[in-house]
């Protein structure tokens, strides 16, 4: 009888952690009220869990991308890397296309770096509810649903088209996510996406995703 051999994934990349994080200041204990933070408990719990995972991965460098220069960096780092003492490289995204940021992510990867953690900061649609910051637009929930669906399928091609497919979604994270995907692609990392949490109690989509490596 032939013995079954269990195959284990071998990661030859120097990327040891990668995640998508939302960045609403309201989830910070110093900003959000206890009542508001209860409404985003799933998001907070998910980020705290990934913070423990990042610590165990022992990265020497963090590359974080964000469309905002203040809370866009500070909120994810509070939960994911509060005690991190290594190098943090911040990458600010602008208005160029998601595909351009995907290519930029490829160029940003440096194989000579040792142990890298990637964080893509960004919120999903801001128009999920009538009482949300931009009211309701049907593009909002469609964008969020398709982004999650394509992430699960590792369908980068369609992810990079989402800004054109749903132009009224009022999202702020797609270019940041595209940058992370470009770095992952260039690194050769063997990654498997997991949606850790998703919710939108205030009319804005908050996604926490773990790219298992």
Question: Model-found features: residue ranges?
Answer:
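Beta-strand elements within well-structured catalytic alpha/beta cores of enzymes
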Residues: 62-66, 114-122
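Flexible, D/E/H-enriched segments
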Residues: 5-61, 67-111, 130-213
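Short, active-site-adjacent cap segments at secondary-structure transitions
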Residues: 125-128
